[in-house]
Amino acid sequence: MQTQLDFWLWNSIISKTDCQKIIDRGLEQLDILQKEGFDSNATTFGDNHKTGTRSISQKDLTQQQLSENNINEKDVYIRDSRIAWLSDQWIYDLIWPWVYKSNNRSGWHYEFDYAEPAQFTIYDKDQFYGWHSDGPNDIHAVKRRKIPGVYDETHTDKALFAYADGLIGKVRKLSITLMLSDPNNYEGGNLKFDRGEHIKNRYEEISGGMVNQGSIVVFPSYKYHCVTPVTKGTRYSLVVWFNGRPMK
């Protein structure tokens, strides 16, 4: 294990057999989505949508650069990957213990009680995820249940899925990435953190050469990060967000 300013890394703690089972399950779910007419290409909000066209690939542009270049954020694809959603209990059983250990040993000590559906992600050659934060706007805290005489209807937004009732009033506290691929099977696709311009060594990059198949990276959801373009092969990963009440 290794601790850093922005993340906690557990190397090779999920077996290769279990990694392959997750990959197989994710590919199965992708096949179902495609048969139902849904596009597996991830949008900025992370959902699956009916097949459409995309315009600009953001890659390494920041929000400030988008503004300075008068690029409409709605015309930009901040990510280029394929995704499917998994809610199998056995997957959570593999992951939860390591999230708890990371939270305690790192000193973060966040309170959380809810895990969102796991996002199985495929990055093929030249695919990427630009700079972003998983929980910058308390995306679930603004949601409200329908209460007769108080709220006429449940307040939601386009990012709300069927599972979101358990997320109402909560924020993302911790994010995890489980590396499902053998690092010998792809190049690039590094998980990269931006510590801020005030830090001497501003960027921290976790490359395939640093982690083995079955490694888990845990980090606070507000941390600014990206996945660099894959230059060779295919990178499989699993992402899960852990939620709790604000300010705890």
Listing of model-derived features with the role each one plays in the protein:
Residues 1-218, 222-248:
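Fe(II)/2-oxoglutarate oxygenase catalytic core
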